Amino acid sequence: SDIIVGYNTYIALVKDLIKDKEVVGNGMRQEVDRCQKAVDLSAEGHQVAVISSGDPGVYGMAGLVLELIQKLPKEARPECEVIPGLTAANTSAAALGAPLMHDYAVISLSDLMTPWEQIKNRAKLAAEGDFVIAIYNPKSRGRATYLDEIRDIVLQYRKPETPVGIVRKAGRPGMNWTISTLEKLPEEHVDMQSTVIIGKSTTFVADGKMITPRGYKA
C-alpha cells in the first residue's frame, strides 16, 4: 500500500511499520468519512490499506468499506482484500486460558448503532442458551450501568460463582487480566479498553486458568 487510512489511535500503534507512506487519519465517530476517503483513493488507482484494531471483520471497518464500494458503478469498483486479524475475544481468551472452547457469543454493549433493548435481549438469549459470552465495549462514562444490567440478566440463568475473565488492553502493551466471578463483577475495574468473558454453566477455574470443556472424554 502507498496510503494508510485509519483511526488516529490505531495508526499510532503501527507507526513503526508505516515508514514514509502517506497517512490519512481522523478521530472517533468519523468512520464513514474515513472509509469513504479510502474507497475514493482506491478508485483513483492508489493502493490503500485501512487499519482496524483486532479483526477488520469483527466490529472493524471491513463491512463499511465493502458497503461503500457497492455504491460505485460496477466497472468503477476497486478490488478489496480483507486481511484477517486477531479479535479481542481470542486474544483475551488466550490470556485467560481456554474459556471459548465450546459455543460462544460476542456482544458489544455500545448502543451508538444498536438499541439498548436489543442488546439486552441478545444477552438474555445468549445466557438462556448457555453460551459463553464475550463482551466488547463494556463500560464508558455514558454507559456506566450497562455491564451491571447485563450481569443481572445473566444471573437469571447462571450461578453467582460462574467464572468471569476481565482482560484490559488485549494484545497491547500493558495488557493485564484477572479472573473473578459473576457475583463479584461489579467490584472489578472495567473500562472501554476491557474485554469481559462470562463463562457458561460448565466453565471452571484451575491453576489460574479459565477453562470451558469441549466435551472430550479425557
Predicted segments, located by residue:
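Class I SAM-dependent methyltransferase SAM-binding "motif I" and its flanking Rossmann-like core
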Residues: 58-129, 200
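Structural motif
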Residues: 2-3, 21-23, 46-50, 79-81, ...
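Short, surface-exposed amphipathic charged segments that create phosphate/polyanion-binding patches used
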Residues: 37-43, 94-98, 120-123, 177-183
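A contiguous loop/helix-start segment that scaffolds small-molecule binding in enzyme catalytic cores
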Residues: 48, 128-218
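Short, well-ordered secondary-structure micro-motifs
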Residues: 17, 61-62, 92-94, 117-119, ...
